[in-house]
């Protein structure tokens, strides 16, 4: 059976891994998943990422905790295959009054809502992270 929404699966694996206090989670890799994981690493929500394997690449995400609690409080899919959500630069949401991020897919690549606003771009809202 094929996977309908690989990005939602990735976010769910991160959410479940942190709820179970796992050190890391692994999943099948794709360019978009790696771009989202790199963005989460830059923003400090995950500790590290590794891509291994040539034929079927695996993405391994090392989860991050602070004083025993998961760093990621909220990770929620917004745009999905059945209902794509696009926003213009002025309509990009602020998550938790700027404490969280919205991951946006633009024509210049995957970036945060702050970076998209600064670049004057809108795009598809992939997920919210706080």
From Swiss-Prot:
Gene3D superfamilies linked to this entry: 3.30.1370.30, 3.30.1490.10
Recorded coiled-coil stretches: none
Keyword DNA damage listed: no
Pfam families in the record: Ribosomal_S8
PANTHER family reported in the protein's UniProt record: 40S RIBOSOMAL PROTEIN S15A
UniProt xrefs under NCBIfam families: PRK00136.1
Oligomeric and partner information: Part of the 30S ribosomal subunit. Contacts proteins S5 and S12.
Listed name of the protein: Small ribosomal subunit protein uS8
Species whose genome carries this gene: Tolumonas auensis (strain DSM 9187 / NBRC 110442 / TA 4)
């Amino acid at each position: 059976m094929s996977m309908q929404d690989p990005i939602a699966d990735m976010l769910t694996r991160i959410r479940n891994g942190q709820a179970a206090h796992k050190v890391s989670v692994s999943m099948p890799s794709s360019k978009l998943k790696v771009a989202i994981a790199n963005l989460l690493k830059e923003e400090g929500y995950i500790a590290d990422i590794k891509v291994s394997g040539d034929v079927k690449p695996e993405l391994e995400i090392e989860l991050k905790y602070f004083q025993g609690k998961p760093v990621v409080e909220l990770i929620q899919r917004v745009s999905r295959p059945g209902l794509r959500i696009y926003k213009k630069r002025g309509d990009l949401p602020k998550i938790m009054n700027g404490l969280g991020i919205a991951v946006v897919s633009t024509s210049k690549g995957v970036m945060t809502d702050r970076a998209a606003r600064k670049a004057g771009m809108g795009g598809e809202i992939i997920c919210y992270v706080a």
